């Protein structure tokens, strides 16, 4: 990775694309703050650096959530994009362009790359068997299949791995699998899929992996995958699917992970067209520009295996570096909704200054992939000690004397040139740390300098000298040195705390805090009246933030409930005879129509087809089922229940559903092959 500041570099930087299906939380923010700090540093050094990102807007999950909310996928991704961009702005993440993978630019680039791979013989097709939801009419990804783990017997596990024992398996091995979408039993069906022939690029990838493009830990993991053998990569999904249709393949769509990284190109092209930048000068194979992807270690497979091979096969340049980071833990544990440590960006910003978090992350970030722990007690003490107690303290101790004794103007000469020069020269080592993404090391060096500046002021004790007649100039000289040291520290901290740096720039009455500006002394220079640049972290607000982040039911209680099982809270009823049971006439019905009931917050009006007649039933399932998701679905009803007159009409029976203490409702579905009107016995 280049480190020189003299030669102007052309750099394109990306962060992983957040999925347009949920809110930004502190775990996400680690990556965007890390990237933003690095980009701000590069711009401060005078390089041409562009930072682009986009919402990852395709896939089954987007389609299903939009259906659940009763809006189109386009409306959903537009809404989520606005939320994401507002969150990023709160935390000072300054993209040069923020876009969407659901764009015409991304469609064009996806088709161009796919066509290039296809024409070069790197795409194959073959039939595969998959789980199919007969109710929803779609093929199911592994995460949309749940059942009992075949290894340990734990229930409610996903179709590819068990969260209880860690086992991996195929959906076909899952015991009693069901669709997590409809609850139906999946069917095995065959479909033609398109594959990217990754093994064609084995030699190229061996060289790329060894080329210094990833961290050593990531290289070792890639080599493990490499040595275990490359498989072809399934890049297609069947309709219905929200995404881009594959050229010349009706009903087949690009898998979301194919067009997601291509979204980097699309977002950059959108920026290029707006700003007049030469797109090809960054992406052609012989480009001298640098391209860096910042990602989490959980998506290395896509970015460091498939992505470079795709680019190579399409005749484009590959990334200069793929920089991976670890996960965020809070107080030494996985982020938890019940403990209030699963904290959304918006919730944090309602209680605390986002720059606290930017600094804390920087103070702990290295170039490695270890997880970063946000210890809330340490968070408060470190921010208070470093930013407030050390850095801001320098300016606050000196500014008043400059105002009083120098009429707001610094001394005309520097009383400590060697000290100031040492601070200026320290910038090269700090810059090297920033460049290498060793932010924690850079922050330690900055705080060591802050300690030295405070020690200088404490040793000179201008507040004591100010009481002695005739020493006014000496006091002004000391405090002018202090202000200059503060200015240099803010140059070094500007990438980390840009809002605080902007306030400091206003206070110092200077045009820039760019890296080279540290070399210019402020002499006989007017400064503004000092205002507090940062207040201390209020631990009561931390407590309020975590309380606001909690869910009503604690996670620990849920685990206890799961361990006990539903029978502990809802014991089996008194025994009945067979004759009592035989009185119930249970029938298979098809939900022909489902409607909201005006004035009823809990009810849906269901029109049920019994295969020869229809019934109207009012059911209290509105909270969990959208009407359009129910129509066409088979369920079970009590057909001989006496009609019940309600305020909204007459209910002619009852549909059957299971429920739990948390308010969950699970409508019963018969096995495949059942028909309306059949008796359940």
Swiss-Prot record:
Zn(2+) binds at residues 149, 152, 162, 165. It is an enzyme of class 6 (ligase). Pfam families: Anticodon_3 (PF19303), tRNA-synt_1g (PF09334), tRNA_bind (PF01588). InterPro entries: aa-tRNA-synth_I_CS, Anticodon_Met, Met-tRNA-synth_bsu_C, Met-tRNA_ligase_1, Met-tRNA_synth, Methionyl/Leucyl_tRNA_Synth, MetRS_core, MetRS_Zn. PROSITE patterns: AA_TRNA_LIGASE_I (PS00178), TRBD (PS50886). It comes from the Bacteria. Keywords: Aminoacyl-tRNA synthetase, ATP-binding, Cytoplasm, Ligase, Metal-binding, Nucleotide-binding, Protein biosynthesis, RNA-binding, tRNA-binding, Zinc. Binds 1 zinc ion per subunit. Its EC number is 6.1.1.10. Its cofactor is Zn(2+). One of its GO terms (biological process) is methionyl-tRNA aminoacylation. It is found in: Cytoplasm. A motif ('HIGH' region) lies at residues 18-28. Its main location: cytoplasm. The keyword Plastid does not apply. Residues 580-681 form the tRNA-binding domain. The keyword Zinc-finger does not apply. GO terms for molecular function: ATP binding; metal ion binding; methionine-tRNA ligase activity; tRNA binding. A motif ('KMSKS' region) lies at residues 334-338. Homodimer. Belongs to the class-I aminoacyl-tRNA synthetase family. MetG type 1 subfamily. Is required not only for elongation of protein synthesis but also for the initiation of all mRNA translation through initiator tRNA(fMet) aminoacylation. This is Methionine--tRNA ligase. It comes from Chromohalobacter salexigens (strain ATCC BAA-138 / DSM 3043 / CIP 106854 / NCIMB 13768 / 1H11).
């Amino acid at each position: 990775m280049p480190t020189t500041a003299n030669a102007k570099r052309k750099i394109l930087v990306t962060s992983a694309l957040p999925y347009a299906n949920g809110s930004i939380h502190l775990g996400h923010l680690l990556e965007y703050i890390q990237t933003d700090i690095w980009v701000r540093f590069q711009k401060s050094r005078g390089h041409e650096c562009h930072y682009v990102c986009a919402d990852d807007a395709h896939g089954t999950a987007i389609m299903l959530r939009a259906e659940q909310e009763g809006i189109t996928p386009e409306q959903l991704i537009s809404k989520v994009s606005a939320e994401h961009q507002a969150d990023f702005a709160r935390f000072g993440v300054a993209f040069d362009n923020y876009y969407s993978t659901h764009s015409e630019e991304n469609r064009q680039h996806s088709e161009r790359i796919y066509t290039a791979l296809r024409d070069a013989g790197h795409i194959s097709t073959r039939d595969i068997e998959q789980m199919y939801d007969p109710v929803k009419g779609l093929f199911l990804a592994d995460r949309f299949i749940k059942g009992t783990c075949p290894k340990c017997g734990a229930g409610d596990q996903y179709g590819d791995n068990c969260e209880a024992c860690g086992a991996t398996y195929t959906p076909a091995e899952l015991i009693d699998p069901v669709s997590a979408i409809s609850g139906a039993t999946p069917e095995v069906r065959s479909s033609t899929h398109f594959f990217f022939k990754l093994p064609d690029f084995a030699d190229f990838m061996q060289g790329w992996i060894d080329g210094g493009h990833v961290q050593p830990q990531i290289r070792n993991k890639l080599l493990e995958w490499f040595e275990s053998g490359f498989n072809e990569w399934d890049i297609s999904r069947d309709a219905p699917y929200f995404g881009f249709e594959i050229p010349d393949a009706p009903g087949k769509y690009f898998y979301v992970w194919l067009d997601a990284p291509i979204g980097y190109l699309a977002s950059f092209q959108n920026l290029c067209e707006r700003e007049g930048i030469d797109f090809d000068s960054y992406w052609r194979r012989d480009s001298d520009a640098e391209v860096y992807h910042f990602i989490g270690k959980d998506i290395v497979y896509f970015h460091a295996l498939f992505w470079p091979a795709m680019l190579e096969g399409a005749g484009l340049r590959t990334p200069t570096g793929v920089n991976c980071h670890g996960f965020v833990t809070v107080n030494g544990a996985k982020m938890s909704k019940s403990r209030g440590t699963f904290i959304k960006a918006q919730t944090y910003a309602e209680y605390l200054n986002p720059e606290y978090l930017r600094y804390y992350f920087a103070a702990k970030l290295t170039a490695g992939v270890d997880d970063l722990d946000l210890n809330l007690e340490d968070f408060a003490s470190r921010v208070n000690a470093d930013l407030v107690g050390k850095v801001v303290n320098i300016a606050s101790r000196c500014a008043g004397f400059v105002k009083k004794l120098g009429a707001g103007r610094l001394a005309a000469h520097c009383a400590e040139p060697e000290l100031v020069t040492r601070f200026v020269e320290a910038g090269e080592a700090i810059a090297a740390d920033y460049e290498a993404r060793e932010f924690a090391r850079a922050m330690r060096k900055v705080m060591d300098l802050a300690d030295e500046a405070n020690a200088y002021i404490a040793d000179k004790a201008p507040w004591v000298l100010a009481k002695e007649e005739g020493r006014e100039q000496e006091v002004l000289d000391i405090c002018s040195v202090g202000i200059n040291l503060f200015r240099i520290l803010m140059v070094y901290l500007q990438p980390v705390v840009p809002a605080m740096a902007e306030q400091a720039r206003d206070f110092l009455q200077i045009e820039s805090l760019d890296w080279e500006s540290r070399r210019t002394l402020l002499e006989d220079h007017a400064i503004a009246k000092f205002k507090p640049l940062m207040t201390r972290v209020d631990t009561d607000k931390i407590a309020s933030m975590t309380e606001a982040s909690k869910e009503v039911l604690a996670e620990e209680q849920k685990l206890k409930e799961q361990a006990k099982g539903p029978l502990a809270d809802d014991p089996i009823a008194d025994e009945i005879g067979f004759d009592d049971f035989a009185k119930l006439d249970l029938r298979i019905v098809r939900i022909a129509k489902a409607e909201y009931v005006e004035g009823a917050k809990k009810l849906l009006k269901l029109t049920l087809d019994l295969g020869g007649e229809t019934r109207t039933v009012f059911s209290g399932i509105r909270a969990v089922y959208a009407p359009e998701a129910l129509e066409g679905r088979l369920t079970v009803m009590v057909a001989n229940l006496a009609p019940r007159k309600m305020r909204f009409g007459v209910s002619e029976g009852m549909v059957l559903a299971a429920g739990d203490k948390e308010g969950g409702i699970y409508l019963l579905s018969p096995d495949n092959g059942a028909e309306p009107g059949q008796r359940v016995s």
